[in-house]
Each structure stands twice: as C-alpha cells, then as structure tokens.
Amino acid sequence: MAHFAKIGVDNTVLNVVALRNINCVDEDGVEKESIGKEYLEQNTGHSAWVQCSANTQDGVHKEGRTPLRGSFPSKGWVYDSTNDIFYNPNAKPYNSWVLNTNTSRWEPPTARPTETDAERAAGKCYKWNETNKAWELISGVGVSGA
C-alpha cells in the first residue's frame, strides 16, 4: 500500500489515505508518486496530495530504506514544501525550540546535558527552562527532561 496525505490550502494535512499499489505504478511496475497523485485527483476531485510513508518516523525508515518526508503524518500535521517534510506543529513543547528538518522533530536550541552517575543517584535530572532558555538540573522523584 502507498500512502498519501490530502493537503489543505494552508499546507495542513486534512487526511491520510492508503492507495493500492496498482493505482500508483507505471507499466514497468515502478511506484511513482505522480501516478498516485493523478489517480487521487481524478477520483476525489481534490488537487493537493503528497506521498508519505507509514514506515518513516523521525527521519528514519523502519526497514532501513530511504526515509520519506521526515515522519508519517496525521490529520492536523503540516507539510513543509520548502524542506519536503511533514511535522506536527502541536508537538512543539516550547517557543524557543526549533524544527529539525532532517528528523521532523522539535529540538531545544542547546543540547540536553547528560546527568552524571552521582546526579542520577541523587534523583536529579535536567529540565528545560523556557524563561532562561537553558537546561536546569532539578531534584525530585519521577521528574524527567522534556
């Protein structure tokens, strides 16, 4: 099965559909996005479709193949045509975090430090502080970084 995202005027994913492979292959049996898009346009009347892969997540293909467009989208995600990726705008945890266009994940402006063994033993971990735009070492049971 091939998967295609139905794209709205603001590049928001309206829906994701599965398409039988027979509807998106050429005469040599090679899957082509353009054939799938044409099939969907003719059969739905909607003109904006972008192929996606159910096997791609965070910029990695589960089967070791070439990842397709960052991550498999859901309704409400955004298709970034400049970077050719899908991303979840609602997954952005803090305003200062930026979109990694290789993985389609939101990342902090500075990497999260690794706790030392002593810090972990003391029940400490790093948590993002948006006000200071920095990682802070905090204490507490069951706390975790963002």
Residue map of PLM features:
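Viral virion structural and adsorption modules
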Residues: 2-146
